[in-house]
């Protein structure tokens, strides 16, 4: 090997080494533990800058269960459960499957009602074209899909904040392209849910919905965020899982904290609460 060939080889080895990469193009570097503060900052900034450029001023945040299915899916689940129970009437798993299928089918009404609510909100923001009251969800299936779908069917925009999970989660197809953001950090995602929020509507859901609800209640309780209507959709459902009055009776929250939220039972009532809170009529 000539001296030039040896020199060229050494230069190539230098340039191929990760240390030579531009810092912002070095994924191993960017993903390192020491760079977590930078990743947190970027995850906060990217959606903020995008939404600013799109003129999105405020949102209506909709939470709810991923397992709240549209009617046809609920009916299919019920048919499957019935068939399994008829085949093995003494099987405890088949009995349990039947109970769950009955409840999923019952809750399918919430999918349709959420869809209708999102249409009401979207028809308003379409009328004024001012970047206000844009539907925002977590981007998944169930209630989140219903809200994005309602906005889509009304011919308007809606956005979503998706999250990376150990199991694959893809965004639903009704989100407006260019308005779906993927997050790695739950904390930054939660912050973005509330930064532009002018209302929070919690449809029936599980741990994730409860997490977002109690985060918002805590921030309102402590005066750490803007005053917004916090709406629990379906008093029947929420009374069944949380006894808020018990918390007040036990003295662990103030009686006044019960005024931080309210219940609604129809799409129209829910939208009326938001309109009244913000002082506008249609």
Predicted regions: what is each one?
Residues 2-4, 8, 12, 276-282:
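C-terminal amphipathic helix plus adjacent low-complexity
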Residues 8-9, 14-158:
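Glycine-rich beta-alpha loop segments
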Residues 52-55, 127-129, 152, 172-174, ...:
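Solvent-exposed alpha-helices and their adjacent loops that cap or buttress functional pockets
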Residues 77-79, 152-153, 215-220, 246-250, ...:
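Short, solvent-exposed amphipathic alpha-helical segments in soluble enzyme
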Residues 136-203, 214:
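Phosphate/pyrophosphate-binding betaalpha-module
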Residues 155-168, 203, 217-240, 256:
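Short, acidic/small-residue loops that bind anionic groups at enzyme active sites
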Residues 184-231, 278-282:
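Active-site/ligand-binding-proximal alpha/beta "capping" segment
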Residues 232-282:
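C-terminal functional extensions of proteins
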């Amino acid at each position: 090997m000539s001296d030039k060939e040896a020199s060229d080889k050494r230069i190539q080895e230098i340039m191929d080494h990760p240390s030579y990469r531009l810092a912002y193009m070095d994924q191993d570097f960017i993903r390192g533990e020491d760079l977590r503060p930078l990743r947190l900052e970027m995850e906060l900034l990217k959606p903020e800058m995008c939404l600013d450029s799109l003129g999105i001023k405020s949102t209506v945040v909709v939470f709810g269960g991923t397992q709240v299915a549209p009617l046809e899916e609920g009916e299919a689940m019920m048919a499957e459960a019935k068939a399994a129970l008829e085949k093995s009437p003494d099987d405890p798993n088949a009995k349990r499957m039947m109970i769950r299928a009955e409840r999923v089918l019952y809750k399918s009404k919430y999918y349709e009602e959420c869809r209708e609510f999102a249409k009401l909100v979207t028809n308003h923001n379409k009328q004024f074209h001012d970047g206000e009251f844009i539907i925002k969800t977590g981007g998944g299936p169930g209630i989140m899909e219903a809200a994005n779908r309602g906005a889509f069917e009304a011919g308007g925009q809606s956005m979503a904040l998706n999250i990376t999970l150990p199991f694959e989660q893809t965004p639903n197809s009704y989100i407006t392209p260019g308005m779906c953001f993927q997050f790695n950090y739950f904390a930054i995602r939660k912050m973005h849910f509330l930064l532009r929020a002018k209302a929070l509507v919690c449809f029936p859901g599980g741990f994730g919905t409860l997490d977002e609800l109690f985060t918002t209640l805590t921030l309102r309780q402590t005066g750490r965020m803007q005053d917004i209507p916090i709406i629990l959709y379906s008093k029947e459902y929420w009374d069944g899982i949380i006894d808020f009055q018990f918390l007040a009776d036990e003295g662990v929250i103030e009686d006044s904290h019960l005024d931080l939220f309210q219940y609604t039972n129809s799409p129209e009532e829910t939208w009326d609460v938001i309109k009244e809170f913000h002082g506008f009529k249609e």
